[in-house]
Amino acid sequence: MKKILTLFAVVGLMAFSSCSDDDNDNVDYDTFPYAFEIKNVDLGRVTDNEYNLKSTFNFEINDNLRDDETVLIYRLTDIVNSNTPVWQLIPRSVYFNNGDVIDYYFDFSKIDFIITARASFNLINAPDFINDQTFRVVLVPSDLAASVNKNNYLEVMKAAKLNESQVQKINF
């Protein structure tokens, strides 16, 4: 009888030890952090007070956006000490002392994106805000975007494990 119980115990142990649920079915291995920079671009006129830039992800990264990716776009607003860029997350509003305002914002689909500057005045009178603009587009998994301070470009890059050498530079 002891031999039969031992046999059942060994067979049972082998049967249950081979069953596991670590197949990682819920892991999205296609989503990856990615960053690219659109340098020195002039936004195109839509109306006197609205200018934009349209592009496709396929053009920028040779692929469309995936379901679980979040798009973060930063605008270069300054350079400190000739080598330290200042990146501001958009959407962003720039207010002037006279009450005028410029809003930078973007929208996107899985295929394309549009970065827009819209003002309460004719933007041709403020070329510094529409010409020679530089933007950083960072694509990160949505769960990472939910857990990091998106306003801080450096924190986003650190959390995404991206460094400056991995940012693809694109000249329009």
Which positions does each model-derived feature cover?
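C-terminal motif of bacterial Sec signal peptides marking the signal peptidase cleavage site
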Residues: 15-18
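First exposed extracellular module after export/assembly in secreted or surface-exposed proteins
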Residues: 28-172
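Sec-dependent N-terminal signal peptides
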Residues: 6-13
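Positively charged n-region of N-terminal signal peptides that target proteins for export
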Residues: 1-4
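Bacterial signal peptide processing site
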Residues: 20-23
